[in-house]
Amino acid sequence: MLQVLRVSAPCFAFVDTIGSIGVCRVVRFTTFHNTPIEVYNKKVNDGVWKRDPYQETAVKAINRLYTELESYTQPPITQDSMPAEKGSILSWISPLKKMFSRKKSPTLTSSLPVPGMPKGIYLYGDVGCGKTALMDLFYHNLPPNVTRSQRIHFHAFMMQVHRTSHDLQDRYGFEIDFIDHIASGIAKETTVLCFDELQVTDVADALLLRRLFEALMKYGVVIFITSNRAPSDLYKNGIQRESFIPCIKLLEHRLQVICLDSPNDYRRLKSKTEDTYLYPANSPEVKKALENWFLCYADEKDPAHQDEVEVFGRKIIVPKASGNVAWFTFEQLCGEPKSAADYLSLASRYHVFIVSDIPKLSIESKDLIHRFITFIDALYDTHGKLILSSEVPVQEIYPTAPSEVLSSTADPAAKGKIESHYHGAFGGIEEVFTFTRCLSRLSEMKKQSWIHSP
């Protein structure tokens, strides 16, 4: 089934949720085929971008990939026929054959690269250093012979992977290799695949990615990844991390790893802003301002009402909505368990969000801040607009440095425990790290250019 989703205004994407993985396929119309380095230099000369030696190093690597893609032909993709659906007599025989089979599955490191396949790119660096902009520079200026390309946020991609795996399991049980089938489906429609904001915090994703990346490369898919972390730092201190190490080695071996160590945070360059992040939340003036923002974006033909958004058969209640604007309190948005799929579905349904009454959170509030960060990622990726009210300035709602972590806890014994947790445990440090990235995105989303974009 094909769906049309707004990916980033004013772009649209057709999403096939069953036939393939459902990755967003954005149709690009290009007249001139300049190389990435030519486009970069023009942006610098026109004053659109600031010359940055760190970015120039990355652009040279991107241009290398462009040149290699010009002469690359992806091999034809063949896929085994589907097995009998679950419940048929054949579905009972196959497991017995597998039980007595001594044939070993090929290991990840044993598969060889496709002949002539270009080496992809893994671009990482601090928040706001321009990773996504450079990926877009590459994606929107591919060689004319590359007609099948896809770019997707990592959260959205994994959501579709899990959804497709679930559909296949319902239909065929465990009679097929889900990962290989998904990868071949993507490869049939994709030569270049761009992942934005790769991060691994879930054990299920960690174990799945190891096989998925290998399968994609086996089918000749050239991969470009952006992340805030080096491959060696992915899923650090995570559960069963030793099982993820082969995936790290694979990324380091098959992709050109580039550290974008630019000291500039381009999202925080001076820009005129409007009052969209308001505090203190309990102030009558702030409450009135939020009402005015809601009226500004509301549809007068659609009176404010409670709405519902369905995700995988579940219903998410939207407390107050009108047209393309939705209003949640922080408790309503993040107080109960919600997944990346939930937030992406909300961000696809509404273009403007008002989030009120955000409290100051302690280091122990990992679940709450994780959901908030996931929501901001979904809203940023769909270029949604955000108005919020908080107890304290937004940059203070969660600790961002060890001193803040300790000062948020009064009990000396608890401080020692938290200090140990902060420096040694995966969960606490991960939320502190990702909240720093989140603040950079929030800063960009406050700019006038973002607020007044379509």
Curated annotation (Swiss-Prot):
Tell me which UniProt keywords the record has, alphabetically. ATP-binding, Nucleotide-binding
One GO location term (cellular component): cytoplasm
Offer an example of a GO molecular function term for this protein.
Answer: ATP binding
**Pfam families from the UniProt entry:** AFG1_ATPase (PF03969)
One GO BP annotation is: protein quality control for misfolded or incompletely synthesized proteins
**What is the name listed in the Swiss-Prot or TrEMBL entry for this protein?**
Uncharacterized protein C115.02c
UniProt record similarity statement: Belongs to the AFG1 ATPase family.
Stored InterPro entries: ATPase_AFG1-like, P-loop_NTPase
Q: Which positions does UniProt annotate for ATP binding?
A: 125-132
